């Protein structure tokens, strides 16, 4: 597999690391990244591993090696830049990079940029749209994927393997559902972090130190999620097992219900979904 990254930031770094750790069959890998500090970080982190694995690699500010032009149709380009910079990054690509963008397979991991928009910029419909999340940085991410109808089953499998290197993958058949994916899992880590903030602050108000409250909050979430995943039981069943009639958990849950906790979460996700759809219109 030949891989060309446009953008060498955190998500590109996570993907490269995951692919190398998974012993993926990469023949060539190049990153177009104008920031010299980012180039140096990539070089420092991955050069030795790539040499050991026999991967032809390079990091450059503007151009891809000529070898990519020879196999453009079978190469992948990963668009790993911020959505507001995507159009400019595509327009500035020249030579072999332009050949891969126009003839190869394209995986975009930018929020809010539709498949049709990318296909229009590149005159290439072989586009897969992905929405990863930040836990991919520790190989615990989850990515929603959606592909143009012209993307072959083999190419879909390759795109899935790319994103599975940093976590789990969920396919959606209708692109508007990518806005829901963005709202739920793309933005989801921020909701979890806010919840931990709230738990920690509340624990401090009840007399615990910040360190105690943070440790209790983080490990309660980690343990509860591990139990949920390993038990195979629905979250409602596990919740009921913790909740004794007239007990402390019942009192806390009743307070959450009075404050319409479930409706609050639904409203938050709807707001994120609507903003994602709005961004898709802005980036046309």
Tell where the protein language model's regions lie, with residue ranges:
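NAD(P)+-binding Rossmann beta1-loop-alpha1 motif at the extreme N-terminus of oxidoreductases
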Residues: 1-69, 76, 141, 204-206
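Small-residue helix-packing motif on alpha-helices
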Residues: 29, 39, 209-216, 238
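Rossmann-like NAD(P)(H) cofactor-binding subdomain of soluble oxidoreductases
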Residues: 36, 40-42, 46, 63-145
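Internal alpha-helical scaffold of NAD(P)-dependent oxidoreductase catalytic cores
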Residues: 117-126, 142-180, 192-230, 275
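Short pre-catalytic strand/loop immediately N-terminal to key active-site residues, enriched for Gly-Thr
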Residues: 177-183, 235-240
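NAD(P)-dependent Rossmann-like dehydrogenase/reductase catalytic/cofactor-binding core
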Residues: 218-284
């Amino acid at each position: 597999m030949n891989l060309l990254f446009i953008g060498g930031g955190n998500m590109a770094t996570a993907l490269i690391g995951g692919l190398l750790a998974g012993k993926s069959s990469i023949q060539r890998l190049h990153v177009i990244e104008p920031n010299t500090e980012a180039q140096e970080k990539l070089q420092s982190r991955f050069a030795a591993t790539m040499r050991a694995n026999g991967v032809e690699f390079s990091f450059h500010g503007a151009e891809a090696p000529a070898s990519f032009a020879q196999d453009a149709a079978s190469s992948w380009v990963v668009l790993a830049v911020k959505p507001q910079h995507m159009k400019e990054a595509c327009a500035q690509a020249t030579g072999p990079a332009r050949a891969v963008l126009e003839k190869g397979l394209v995986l975009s991991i930018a929020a809010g940029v539709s498949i049709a928009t990318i296909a229009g910029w590149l005159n290439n419909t072989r586009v897969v749209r992905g929405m990863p999340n930040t836990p991919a940085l520790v190989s615990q991410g989850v990515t929603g994927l959606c592909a143009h109808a012209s993307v072959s089953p083999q190419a879909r499998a390759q795109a899935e393997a790319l994103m599975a290197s940093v976590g789990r993958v969920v396919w959606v058949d209708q692109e508007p559902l990518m806005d829901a994916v963005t709202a739920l899992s793309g933005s989801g880590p921020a909701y979890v972090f806010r919840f931990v903030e709230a738990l920690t602050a509340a624990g401090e108000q009840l007399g615990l130190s910040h360190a105690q409250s943070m440790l209790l909050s983080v490990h309660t979430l980690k343990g509860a999620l591990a139990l949920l995943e390993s038990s195979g039981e629905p979250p409602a069943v596990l919740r009921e097992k913790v909740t004794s009639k007239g007990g402390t958990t019942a009192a806390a849950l009743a307070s959450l219900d009075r404050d319409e906790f479930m409706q609050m979460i639904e409203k938050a996700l709807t707001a994120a979904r609507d903003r994602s759809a709005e961004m898709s219109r802005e980036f046309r």
